């Protein structure tokens, strides 16, 4: 099922439907837009018919200079069965040739009061958000000091209980159990909760609780950019865990690599506090303050000084 149809654009941007009502369910598969200026001159060799077409003042002013026969020919070529819609900006008058071609092909012809540049920008942002690659990850997403922390780990390791403690400490829950992630940009992942389980948290032995009802609207948020992954795993005595923080793991989600920290879980460890500190330390590293690197440099300086003596 297509993620976006022409009907969605009409509703989202309050566009006026002039003709082609039968085609409002046409799918839109790309966020790229087209301003068919060179096509108006008759060059259709590389016409991107699958894109939303925008006709601004420049295109329609040039169109007025054409002969009647040329106008009919160009508009028939523009209105294909593949084209999602044509949008006329600035509330300009609709050429009769375009109206006729739209009716014959069943292609939606729309109109907006916005300028071409403004509408183009808004359409691109909307379509990129809707058509972005998506995936779902088993885990919990929490906003900690402005850092979107995705807590992962095998079932029963304590992810939801840790999230509950973080919420009690003033942080905000985004999603529990299933985190829907979309890649809005090359390095931007945004996580949210499925509508069915939004603001809900499952605690074994207690059941399902509504975080917003219990802790208020300030304890939840609808979406958050993910910048850090913390993986919880049962403590393995045979495994060597990072004790300095010099080595940085990475986790790839869709096409974006995120910093990953592995936290071993065992009785007596306050995971909520550790994750809080991990988020703050991550922010410090992004600001250029790396405590592990500073310690390493001091250690190397001390060793060199000792060797000189």
Swiss-Prot record:
Keywords: ATP-binding, Carbohydrate metabolism, Kinase, Magnesium, Metal-binding, Multifunctional enzyme, Nucleotide-binding, Serine/threonine-protein kinase, Transferase. Its EC number is 2.7.11.-, 2.7.4.-. Its cofactor is Mg(2+). GO terms for biological process: regulation of carbohydrate metabolic process. ATP binds at residues 153-160. Residues 201-210 are annotated as: Important for the catalytic mechanism of both phosphorylation and dephosphorylation. Pfam families: Hpr_kinase_C, Hpr_kinase_N. The keyword GTP-binding does not apply. One of its GO terms (molecular function) is protein serine/threonine/tyrosine kinase activity. It is an enzyme of class 2 (transferase). InterPro entries: HPr(Ser)_kin/Pase, Hpr_kin/Pase_C, Hpr_kin/Pase_Hpr_N, P-loop_NTPase, Ser_kin/Pase_Hpr-like_N_sf. It catalyses: [HPr protein]-L-serine + ATP = [HPr protein]-O-phospho-L-serine + ADP + H(+); [HPr protein]-O-phospho-L-serine + phosphate + H(+) = [HPr protein]-L-serine + diphosphate. The keyword Metal-binding applies. Residues 264-269 are annotated as: Important for the catalytic mechanism of dephosphorylation. Mg(2+) binds at residues 160, 202. Both phosphorylation and phosphorolysis are carried out by the same active site and suggest a common mechanism for both reactions. Homohexamer. Catalyzes the ATP- as well as the pyrophosphate-dependent phosphorylation of a specific serine residue in HPr, a phosphocarrier protein of the phosphoenolpyruvate-dependent sugar phosphotransferase system (PTS). HprK/P also catalyzes the pyrophosphate-producing, inorganic phosphate-dependent dephosphorylation (phosphorolysis) of seryl-phosphorylated HPr (P-Ser-HPr). The Walker A ATP-binding motif also binds Pi and PPi. This is HPr kinase/phosphorylase. It comes from Bacillus cereus (strain G9842).
């Amino acid at each position: 099922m297509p993620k976006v149809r022409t009907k969605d654009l009409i509703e989202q941007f309050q566009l006026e439907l002039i003709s082609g009502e039968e085609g409002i369910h046409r799918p839109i598969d790309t966020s790229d837009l087209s301003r068919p200026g060179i096509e108006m001159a008759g060059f259709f060799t590389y016409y991107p018919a699958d894109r939303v077409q925008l006709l601004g003042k420049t295109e329609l002013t040039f169109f007025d200079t054409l002969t009647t026969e040329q106008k009919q020919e160009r508009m028939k070529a523009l209105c294909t069965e593949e084209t999602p819609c044509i949008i006329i900006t600035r509330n300009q008058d609709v050429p009769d040739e375009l109206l006729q071609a739209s009716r014959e092909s069943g292609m939606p012809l729309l109109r907006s009061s916005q300028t071409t540049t403004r509408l183009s920008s808004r359409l691109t942002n909307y379509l990129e958000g809707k058509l972005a690659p998506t995936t779902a990850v088993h885990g919990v997403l929490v906003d900690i000091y402005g850092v979107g922390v995705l807590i992962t780990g095998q079932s029963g390791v304590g992810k939801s209980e840790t999230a509950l403690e973080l919420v009690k400490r003033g942080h905000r829950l985004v999603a529990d159990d299933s985190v829907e992630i979309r890649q809005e940009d090359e390095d931007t992942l945004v996580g949210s909760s499925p509508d069915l389980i939004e603001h809900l948290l499952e605690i074994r032995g207690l059941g399902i609780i509504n975080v917003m009802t219990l802790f208020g609207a300030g304890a939840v948020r609808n979406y958050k950019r993910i910048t850090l992954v913390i993986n919880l795993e049962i403590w393995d005595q045979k495994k060597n865990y990072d004790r300095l923080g010099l080595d940085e793991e990475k986790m790839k989600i869709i096409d974006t690599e995120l910093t990953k920290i592995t936290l071993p879980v065992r009785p007596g460890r306050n995971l909520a506090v550790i994750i809080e500190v991990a988020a703050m330390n991550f922010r410090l590293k992004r600001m250029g303050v790396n405590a592990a690197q500073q310690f390493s440099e001091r250690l190397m300086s001390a060793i060199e000084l000792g060797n000189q003596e």
